[in-house]
């Protein structure tokens, strides 16, 4: 369980448009890339393309790692579906607000159903803030 203090730091640091590194596995080798992500309640949310290499890698192995700004974590990734689907309306609204500076700049074609939301559900993490180390277990 994450402590209230660590959750506050996570929300301050990542509860907005944040760049994090997302690591997947490709043929037994790590593959890492930076992604825009938004943190909420123990998970990162990422808008991506369903046919990308990262999604192909996640289909083969859902175990991932992330890191950014004095934070590292392991978790599992899942395609939760088309960005504009009725099921994702609440999440899409949060992501639209978080990514407001760039979401409608033409990079995303939301008429294409391959524009999906990737959720990274965090398992364990290490967070550093103000000379304090937080070892976090996100399980309930």
Language-model segments: residues:
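Extreme N-terminal tail/first-helix region
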Residues: 1-16
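Short low-complexity stretches enriched in small and charged residues
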Residues: 1-4, 23-36, 72-84
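Short Pro/Gly-enriched beta-strand edge/turn motifs at strand-loop
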Residues: 15-21, 98-103
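Short, basic and Ser/Thr-rich N-terminal targeting/leader segments
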Residues: 16-18, 31-33, 111-114, 121
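Short beta-strand segments
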Residues: 17-50, 56-58, 64-68
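Short amphipathic alpha-helical segments
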Residues: 2-6, 50, 87
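Charged, gly/pro-rich active-site loop segments
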Residues: 72-140
């Amino acid at each position: 369980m994450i402590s209230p203090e660590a959750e506050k730091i996570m929300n301050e640091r990542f509860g907005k448009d944040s760049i994090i590194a997302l690591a997947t596995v490709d043929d037994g080798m790590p593959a890492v890339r930076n992604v825009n992500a938004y943190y909420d309640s123990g998970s990162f949310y990422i808008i991506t393309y369903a046919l990308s290499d990262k999604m192909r890698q996640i289909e083969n192995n859902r175990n991932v790692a992330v890191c950014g700004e004095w934070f590292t974590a392991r978790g599992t990734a899942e395609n939760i579906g088309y960005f504009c689907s009725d099921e994702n309306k609440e999440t899409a609204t949060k992501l639209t607000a978080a990514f407001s500076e760039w979401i409608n700049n033409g990079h995303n074609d939301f008429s294409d159903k391959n524009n999906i939301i990737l959720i990274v559900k965090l398992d364990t993490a290490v967070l550093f803030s103000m000379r304090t180390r937080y070892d976090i277990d996100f399980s309930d």
